[in-house]
Every structure is written in structure tokens, then in C-alpha cells.
């Protein structure tokens, strides 16, 4: 369970990271790319912040994640300049791709019955318990 302090720090980091990442996209003239920070969770010791990114189009996600990880120290420096009056120490950043939308889509497809094993017997192998 996150404390109020962790939630507040996560919110501050999330807001400023969105500004930093979207500013870099605009500055470099990259079109047809949307990066959003879906969640930031901070550890209890406030030492590490896990940043979950949503990238559209999804095919570019691994490439974008690698470029963000390679520029992590520059991003952390920009972040520290923005939050220097709010935080004494900026937590280390760990970036991850947020795949919750894919997970939700798979659940919706299963509930909608698009993969109905009664109508299509080939799907039964996937559903068999081992």
C-alpha cells in the first residue's frame, strides 16, 4: 500500500516526465508517435521510481524504451531541475512498457466470446489444463 507521500511524489514525477518526454518528441520533430506516462510508483524508501510508459504505435515500443533507457541520465537531470524545489533527492528511474491495455483487450475478447471453444474445437488445446 502506497503512502500519501509516495503518491504525491509519484504524481509530481509523472506530470513532469510527461512534459519532458513530449517536449523531446516535439523538439526532435518526431511525428506519428505518442508517449504517455500511465503510472509512476515510488518505493517505500523513495529511492526508486518505476515509470510505466504507454507508446502508440505499439510496434515502436521496444525501440522507444531502449532510447529512453539510454538517455535516462539526461531525463533524470531535466527532472531534477524541474522538481528541485519540491524534492531533495530525485529517485532513480526505472522505465517499463505498460501492457495493461493489451491485457484488457485479451480479457474483453475472451468475455465477448470471439474465441469460443464450442464452435471452434481447435481452441480446446489452449484451454486444457496440464
Curated annotation (Swiss-Prot):
Its main location: cytoplasm. SUPFAM superfamilies: Ribosome-binding factor A, RbfA (SSF89919). InterPro entries: KH_dom-like_a/b, RbfA, RbfA_dom_sf. The keyword Cell inner membrane does not apply. The keyword Membrane does not apply. One of its GO terms (cellular component) is cytosol. One of several proteins that assist in the late maturation steps of the functional core of the 30S ribosomal subunit. Associates with free 30S ribosomal subunits (but not with 30S subunits that are part of 70S ribosomes or polysomes). Required for efficient processing of 16S rRNA. May interact with the 5'-terminal helix region of 16S rRNA. Monomer. Binds 30S ribosomal subunits, but not 50S ribosomal subunits or 70S ribosomes. This is Ribosome-binding factor A. The lineage of its organism: Bacteria, Pseudomonadati, Bacteroidota, Flavobacteriia, Flavobacteriales.
Amino acid at each position: 500500500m502506497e503512502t500519501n507521500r509516495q503518491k504525491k511524489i509519484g504524481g509530481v514525477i509523472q506530470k513532469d516526465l510527461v512534459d519532458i518526454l513530449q517536449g523531446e518528441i516535439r523538439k526532435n520533430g518526431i511525428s506519428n508517435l505518442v508517449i504517455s506516462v500511465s503510472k509512476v510508483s515510488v518505493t517505500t524508501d523513495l529511492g526508486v521510481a518505476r515509470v510505466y510508459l504507454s507508446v502508440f504505435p505499439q510496434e515502436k515500443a521496444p525501440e522507444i524504451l531502449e532510447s529512453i533507457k539510454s538517455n535516462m541520465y539526461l531525463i533524470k537531470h531535466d527532472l531534477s531541475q524541474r522538481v528541485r524545489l519540491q524534492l531533495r533527492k530525485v529517485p532513480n528511474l526505472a522505465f517499463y512498457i505498460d501492457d495493461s491495455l493489451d491485457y484488457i483487450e485479451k480479457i474483453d475478447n475472451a468475455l465477448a466470446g470471439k474465441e469460443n471453444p464450442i464452435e471452434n474445437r481447435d481452441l480446446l488445446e489452449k484451454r486444457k489444463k496440464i
